[in-house]
Amino acid sequence: MEAYNVKIDTFEGPLDLLLHLIGKMEIDIVDISVAEVTDQYVGYIRTMQKFELDVASEYLVMAATLLQLKSKQLLPPVPVEDEEVPDFSEEPTREGLIRQLIEYKAYKEAVVFMREQEEHRLELYTRPGEDLTTYMSEEVSKYDGPLNFSDLLHAYSKMIERKRWKERRKKTIKREERTLEEQMTRLHEHVSSTRQTSFFAFFVERPNVSDLVVTFMALLELIKLRIVETKQLDQDIQISFIEASKKGDEAVAVL
């Protein structure tokens, strides 16, 4: 039997290992031989145990499943009487295994694609918007009113892009981790003392992307609890926090 030099923690799970073995056999997923892939898989697990490497229980469960599928194919079906027809709906099938492998492969390819897109996007920098009010007609009305979740998310996304760009230029990043409750209290105290503040002015002070995420979640929770409200100011994307004065007022942010 072929010796394996790949460590089991290289794979993210039994399906990942199965895809690796199928790839080595150079066959399509739908054309797999259950008996052959079972022998390959069990041989791999036994090699790991031979070298006293820890084998996660999920790998052993998959090995048992493959052996059950192999035995069903090799052994003749057991005849049963009509009145005692068992329910095999929960038993594993070759078709079910193939479906899981196809779905997992599609998931892996999607993850790789999204990571490539993220790396590509981080190499780009969007220049901050300029003040174009001097070029606008006086007849254009300025919007000053409630915001919905999409508006907040758009402004938040712009802050994330800027923060990631700055972090990539730093050799070391000091992370100051805060819980959601701590950030809600901090944001509430800030709004209570200043009565209102600029969205960008407040968020730009966050030390890293992780803190930005927690701060944005804290903002959404305070809006949901009707402690603060948000408004669009003129033609800018800025958002102000205003402490809600009446709990019975109509919600100003749609979550």
UniProtKB/Swiss-Prot annotation:
The keyword Transmembrane does not apply. GO terms for cellular component: cytoplasm. Disulfide bonds: none annotated. Signal peptide: none annotated. Keywords: Cell cycle, Cell division, Chromosome partition, Cytoplasm. It is found in: Cytoplasm. Transmembrane segments: none annotated. GO terms for biological process: cell division; chromosome segregation; DNA replication. InterPro entries: ScpA. Participates in chromosomal partition during cell division. May act via the formation of a condensin-like complex containing Smc and ScpB that pull DNA away from mid-cell into both cell halves. Belongs to the ScpA family. This is Segregation and condensation protein A. It comes from Exiguobacterium sp. (strain ATCC BAA-1283 / AT1b).
